[in-house]
Amino acid sequence: MSSGKSAGKKRLRRVHYYPGCSLMSSAKDFGTSLFQMFRLMGTWVEPLEDWNCCGASPAHSVNPDYATLLAGRNLLLAERQGIDDLYVVCPSCFVRLRTAEKTLSTDGSLNAKLAKACGREYEGGVQVKFTPEILSDAPIVFEKAVMNPLEGLRGVLYFGCLLTRPEWITGFDIRPYERKLKRLVNVLGVETPDWSFSKQCCGSHLAVTKSDMVDGMVDRIRDHARRAGANCIIAFCPLCQVNLELRGKEVEPLPVFYISELIGLAAKLPGHENWVKKHLVDPRPLLSFLELL
């Protein structure tokens, strides 16, 4: 029988997630801030074991079937590990895994190829979910944790284009989460001006092959953010974050934060001062001017 002391302990919610390549490399600080944020929420996060690259744009642009098999292997691993809900941080990874989930459920020949490569077919037992689905129901938790209200920050929420396109694949309606995430950011002390570019494309991987075109796309996003009265952008995608800070030529850049970084700043989570040092557009002058850092 459990003692009264152990029985009274609050059980941590366990969440399984797919890390993806960016979280382990170019967006490593995003990953660190996410883990600190989940700890604040009382959530224990575990990575999918033995995961591989989802294929992202390079693979599915060259060989769609091979890209589906890459993502499909991750779904098989999740099934083997008894994972019902697999949370994904990166929108690009989310779309690739959702695509594999849909394709393997309807294309028997491709599922047979997966079985030949990996030893079994995918049975369709995994739900692929996007990480903000967890965050959207936790504003009260974060409000109680605020030690450093982020007053003076005015950030527009930027989701990018991948989450909702193509709709028949993602089946993801961002609108209810957009309202909830706006409220979450507001409890941190951040104003969230309305704007119409929250789902516009940043150029994605075209930044490598058609950088001039992407510069124009990013300039339009920055221009509309500034016209809305924003002094920063809040992004949910590692690639969008890089493009919005690195690309663009005509419009003065804005700092681009991840929502987990803002939570870390407001709650003074361990390491929060180091995360902002890694940005391509240094947010420290803005944060220092507002006496937030």
Tell where the protein language model's regions lie, with residue ranges.
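Iron-sulfur cluster-binding electron-transfer modules in prokaryotic oxidoreductases
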Residues: 2-293
